[in-house]
Amino acid sequence: MALLQIAEPGQSSAPHQHRIAIGIDLGTTHSLVATVLSGKPKVLNDVQNRRLLPSIVHYGDNTTHYGEEAKPFIIADPKNTIVSVKRFMGRSKADIKFQHPYELVGSENEMPAFETRAGRKTPVEISAEILKQLKDRAEDSLQNPVNGAVITVPAYFDEAQRQATRDAAQLAGLNVLRLLNEPTAAAVAYGLDQESNLATDRNYVIYDLGGGTFDVSILRFSQGVFEVLATGGHTALGGDDLDRLIVKWAKKQLNIDVLSDEDYAVFIVAARQAKEQLSTQDSVELKLLEATLTLDRPTFESIIQVALDKTISVCKRVLRDAKLELTDIQNVVLVGGSTRSYAVQKAVREVFAQEPLCTINPDEVVAIGASITANQLIGNSQDGSLLLDVTPLSLGLETMGGLVERLISRNTAIPVARRQEFTTYQDGQTAMLIHVVQGERDLVEHCRSLGRFVLHGIPPMTAGQARIEVTFQVDADGLLTVSAREATSGVQAHIDIKPSYGLSEADTERLLIEGFQHAEEDKNLRHLKETKVEAERELEALEQALKVDADLLDEKQLDALNSAKESLKAQLEGSDIQAIEHAVQQLKVHSDAFAALRMNRHIDHALKGTKLDDWSKSN
């Protein structure tokens, strides 16, 4: 079999030509752009010397405001001021269950759109406007056009969310070199590969609590290879959620059940300010409408404990996935503005029993890592380290009985390609439905459907003779292509998995947890399903044989065979695996004798009229 070569998308074919590459952290709360100048990464400022661009877009009557200029409109005009658009990326309207002040309308393929003064705007379009601001900032600062960009995404972004990010970049006029997981970018920024001269492998935890997402990754650096051993996270857990918990507490203190959109915006702004101030102060005052509340550190810690517990639970699970103990971890790296909180740092310190690394500005570390990677991919840097991201969830296809055949397991390093042969179930089958799924369960009904396509033109053959090679290929951005090819005829078909909307905020977490909780149950159920499929195949083959050669059996033999057949059918109505297997064996006792009679008949038929000398010569 030929080796499959997968190159980094967009990599420069002219390595000696210096080209402008940027790294972009498209964040929930803030976004940044960085580049490598004279061999050193640098976060680029705007004309007012600001590094952070708040991820906010306001649509006015005749103009659009971005970033800091859009901030005042969060309270003054909340319905037309889009904040934290990243939380809406790749989601359906039904998936968005958290409170927000926007008027969402359905659009094609159930993707939501914001009803604004400037018309309907999709999350992709709004993200594109933020990316365009960062692209313009880079080109103004560098006085040169940008040739390519690496854009970071949460490790737990699924296929739809990654594709939405790529679409936004395309709308912004950016050439995407690669989508890079945010924790992986942080590891690059810290230069953890510089410790590769040590004799032992080095393991690192990247704890990334941003504005809207949480990711934790365990990375290992060994013999020049930088590999993500395991990832976990939550697509809707971050600083925004801490703000909402403070708002919930404040409402309870003030005996308020429901807030208007305008008042809710006031509470959110006050909560965010209080959270930030508590990083350096013991207590703060929240000015809310006509009331003032005092919030101290112990109270704040108790308020957000439920969110911190979720992050710690994910950390422990990822450690188990990587088959590591706490003593195997050399360093813990903090990423994301929310890790500035003393309460977050305290929780991380306690669970990992060591002081976490936070020497690089946690708001900037991801953009810095992205810029270093972009500089490598564009061809400006020859770095010896190899960076391997991983698939967050397993990928497979549906087989008979509604079972999942896994081709690529979760936490497999990407880019990756896997091939496997399948065959037909029925005689004369000329088409095969390929149903692609994502998840950790053994039954299709418990996994997420990613797409379907049909391979037509399979030559009619006896069941089990056709050879269909199915290939799953995941590129460096985590985007999946599935193809199928029939060996004898060469007919083929494929699908690029680009679903119209992604997992809901809890779906990714749910798929993983259910996979662990139901592992034993799924194993038993899979055994039952496989046993039933095999039994049904025996019955179908017997039915076909009886249609042709039933006359070979006398009445007693036929009655015995039919009795065994009906007994097996009755057992298939239940779920006793041993009883089904016993019934299959009893059927085979009778069907094997029938098969011998059939074989003799067909040999006699084949040799009829053939002289012995002719037969000997032909052999």
Curated annotation (Swiss-Prot):
Signal peptide: none
The entry's keywords: ATP-binding, Chaperone, Nucleotide-binding
SUPFAM superfamilies cross-referenced by the UniProt entry: Actin-like ATPase domain, Heat shock protein 70kD (HSP70), C-terminal subdomain, Heat shock protein 70kD (HSP70), peptide-binding domain
One MF term in the entry's GO annotations: ATP hydrolysis activity
Record-linked Pfam families: HSP70
Entry's transmembrane regions: none
GO biological process, one term: iron-sulfur cluster assembly
Origin: domain of life: Bacteria
HAMAP family: HscA
Protein family membership: Belongs to the heat shock protein 70 family.
PANTHER family the UniProt entry points to: HEAT SHOCK PROTEIN 70KDA (PTHR19375)
Annotated NCBIfam families: HscA, PRK05183.1
Function: Chaperone involved in the maturation of iron-sulfur cluster-containing proteins. Has a low intrinsic ATPase activity which is markedly stimulated by HscB.
The protein's name: Chaperone protein HscA homolog
Source organism of this protein record: Acinetobacter baumannii (strain ACICU)
